[in-house]
Amino acid sequence: MIRNVVDKRAVEAAVVDAQRAVAEFDGARQWLAAARQGPMEPLGAEVWVFDTTLAQVLLVKHRWRGWVPPGGKVEPGETPREGASRELLEETGLQPELLPDPAAVAVRSYHPGYPVTLGLSYATVVDAATPFVAEDGQPVAWTRLDEGWESCFPDDLLRIRQHAAWLAGRMGRH
């Protein structure tokens, strides 16, 4: 059941960002090539917010998903990058610039019983002392990457850790 048709601008931006993503999971690029031939489920977008030491990630406690990066559904008229930025602002009050290349592209279901769709993960780095404002009912917290967290997406921990290591290499840290 397709809940909303994804507009052409969003799909075109998703194709470009999927190609530019640092990491690909679940055969996402091939899935997108096939899925764009017909109506698609709404796209998902999230932001992996790292502290400047790349030792922590900012997570939001979702009511049934557990601890997850800030994110959500890409709204009509938005690109995935715009949707990720909007969700980050709504859920944390933060409005940093996202890094140029998306962190990852994956295929997943964001709700039990819903079909899978494309999810794009973007990244940013902010000072851990930067104040944030949590959305009502969704606490926000810095979480150390050397510790785990409860989430309905168990692969996220390793994926986010790998991206932090990749960023550290790009920044000349080891």
Where do the protein language model's features map onto the residues?
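Active-site-proximal or metal-binding-adjacent scaffold patches in catalytic folds
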Residues: 132, 162-174
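A glycine-rich, hydrophobic loop/mini-helix early in the fold
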Residues: 29, 37-66
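Amphipathic, soluble alpha/beta structural segments
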Residues: 1-9, 16-17, 99, 112-115, ...
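Hydrophobic alpha-helical segments that drive targeting, anchoring, or assembly
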Residues: 31-32, 37-39, 49, 74, ...
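Unchanged
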Residues: 74-161
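Acidic, metal-coordinating catalytic segment for phosphate/diphosphate chemistry
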Residues: 2-46
